[in-house]
């Protein structure tokens, strides 16, 4: 770990279509092997599917989904006296967003639809309705934090 100073965070450019930084972060999370144009087409086609299925603005559905997925608490390992404890901690705003995007893509990839566009659209719609794999992951994270509440005094 660096001792001198905190590393500066790199600022991403806003998405040209939706003019949103979180959309750019989602595209970067979807991207595999540096193929950004493929990731962009996947996302924009998924948003078109969302618009057809819900008759709502896809950016609004996506925003609700991210709010529903974002965790407030998580557990972090802390070594105290020779044993490791899972200590519940609050999650920073930046990490909330990062975890939400990561879980959204992870559980979209595990879905059974045919194309990635359909998988992503389905997961976003499910997350906005408080269903789906990403929501289940958040609930599991909360259960872990709740069951380890006794170790909260080890927080740093």
UniProtKB/Swiss-Prot annotation:
InterPro entries: Ribosomal_uS7, Ribosomal_uS7_bac/org-type, Ribosomal_uS7_CS, Ribosomal_uS7_dom, Ribosomal_uS7_dom_sf. SUPFAM superfamilies: Ribosomal protein S7. The keyword RNA-binding applies. PROSITE patterns: RIBOSOMAL_S7. Keywords: Ribonucleoprotein, Ribosomal protein, RNA-binding, rRNA-binding, tRNA-binding. Gene3D superfamilies: Ribosomal protein S7 domain. It holds the Pfam family Ribosomal_S7. GO terms for molecular function: rRNA binding; structural constituent of ribosome; tRNA binding. GO terms for biological process: translation. The keyword RNA-binding applies. GO terms for cellular component: small ribosomal subunit. HAMAP family: Ribosomal_uS7_B. One of the primary rRNA binding proteins, it binds directly to 16S rRNA where it nucleates assembly of the head domain of the 30S subunit. Is located at the subunit interface close to the decoding center, probably blocks exit of the E-site tRNA. Belongs to the universal ribosomal protein uS7 family. Part of the 30S ribosomal subunit. Contacts proteins S9 and S11. PANTHER family: RIBOSOMAL PROTEIN S7. This is Small ribosomal subunit protein uS7.
């Amino acid at each position: 770990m660096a001792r001198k100073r905190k590393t500066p965070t790199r600022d991403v450019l806003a998405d040209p279509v939706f003019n949103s930084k979180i959309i750019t972060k989602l595209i970067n999370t979807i991207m595999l092997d540096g193929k950004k144009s493929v990731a962009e087409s996947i996302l924009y086609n998924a948003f078109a599917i969302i618009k057809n299925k819900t008759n709502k603005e896809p950016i609004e559905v996506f925003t609700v989904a991210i709010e529903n997925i974002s965790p407030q608490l998580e557990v972090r390992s802390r070594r105290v006296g020779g044993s490791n404890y899972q200590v519940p901690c609050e999650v920073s705003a930046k990490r909330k967003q990062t975890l939400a995007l990561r879980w959204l893509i992870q559980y979209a990839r595990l879905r059974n639809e045919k194309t990635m566009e359909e998988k992503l659209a389905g997961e976003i719609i499910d997350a906005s309705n408080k269903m789906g794999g990403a929501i289940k992951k958040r609930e599991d994270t909360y259960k872990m934090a709740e069951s380890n509440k006794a170790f909260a005094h080890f927080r740093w």
